[in-house]
Amino acid sequence: MQLLTIVWTSLAAGIMATATPTSLPLCSMVDRPCKCPPGTTFKNLTTYGVIGAPARDVQDIMGSSAVFDLQFQGGLVPSSTKGKDNVPGAVRSFNFSGPAGYYVISEQVCLRLRMNSGHVADVYKLTKWKTSPDGSFNQQYQQSPKPPVVQVPGAGAYHGGWTSIVGQQTVVRNETAIAWKNWRCETGETFPSATSHEGGITNTSAVLEKQGKLTGVSIAAFTIFNEVRDD
């Protein structure tokens, strides 16, 4: 039921986003209907799934230590790191291969909050990190500084990207609903977000299963494109 609620909320936001682009604010970390720079494409998608484990255990994999330790993303290993894991100022960098060459992606932690309830460079900044007593969490990060144009050799270019990963403890003690949302402005196809995020949720279940913590029912990850629009 909670997963359906999360899905419906996201779909409703997508429906609202059909407003005339010229009347919308520029895209930012604020999750709302928005417009991209002229000549680029706006993409808004969310990957959903249920992991059969308590949110606290899911958070250990996808949240609280997931700046430098990315085992849930297929063993992705940073090529370099700076600072302390998941602490403001920490930086992780990756060497990725595009269709026509290599490029470097760096992601930086900016803010962490707790709640009691060709070579190119692409920098992302963690803008929000919230947790609740039941283990639910919300992690948000964005391309930073003010979105530069980042060329991916042979694939296109980033003109801004924003991500939110929500892990919500359900009424079932050992089940966590996941909503992994990405909205971005780009030309071409910079990154297969749907495939990557679905794999990340699946891998998290696999890691927890190896740890003997996957005791509930998991629902396979799936992605809904809320909106794709040329601006």
Swiss-Prot record:
Task: Say if the entry is tagged with keyword Signal.
Answer: yes
SS bonds (residue pairs) = none
Keyword check for Glycoprotein: yes
Task: Note the superkingdom of the native organism.
Answer: Eukaryota
Usage in biotechnology: Azasperpyranones display potential anti-cancer activities. Azasperpyranones A, C, D, and F exhibit potent growth-inhibitory activity against the A549, HepG2, HCT-116, and HL-60 cell lines, with IC(50) values of 2.39-14.42 mm, respectively. Moreover, azasperpyranone D significantly inhibits HCT-116 xenograft tumor growth in BALB/c-nu mice. In addition, azasperpyranones A and C can bind with four kinds of therapeutic targets for cancer, eEF2K, FGFR, survivin, and TNF-a.
Keywords for the protein's UniProt record, in alphabetical order: Glycoprotein, Signal
Description of the deletion phenotype: Abolishes the production of azasperpyranone A.
* Annotated metabolic or biological route of this protein: Secondary metabolite biosynthesis
| Induction remark | Expression is induced by the azasperpyranone cluster A-specific transcription factor ATEG_03638 which is itself regulated by the azasperpyranone transcriptional regulator ATEG_07667.
Q: What exactly does this protein do?
A: Part of the cluster A that mediates the biosynthesis of azasperpyranones, members of the azaphilone family that exhibit anti-cancer activities. Azasperpyranones are synthesized by 2 clusters, A and B. Cluster A is responsible for the production of the polyhydric phenol moiety while the azaphilonoid scaffold is produced by the cluster B. The non-reducing polyketide synthase ATEG_03629 produces 5-methyl orsellinic acid, which is then reduced to 5-methyl orsellinic aldehyde by the NRPS-like protein ATEG_03630.
Give the residue range of the signal peptide: 1-19
Species annotation: Aspergillus terreus (strain NIH 2624 / FGSC A1156)
Q: Which residues are glycosylated?
A: 44, 95, 174, 203
Q: What is this protein called?
A: Azasperpyranone A biosynthesis cluster A protein ATEG_03636
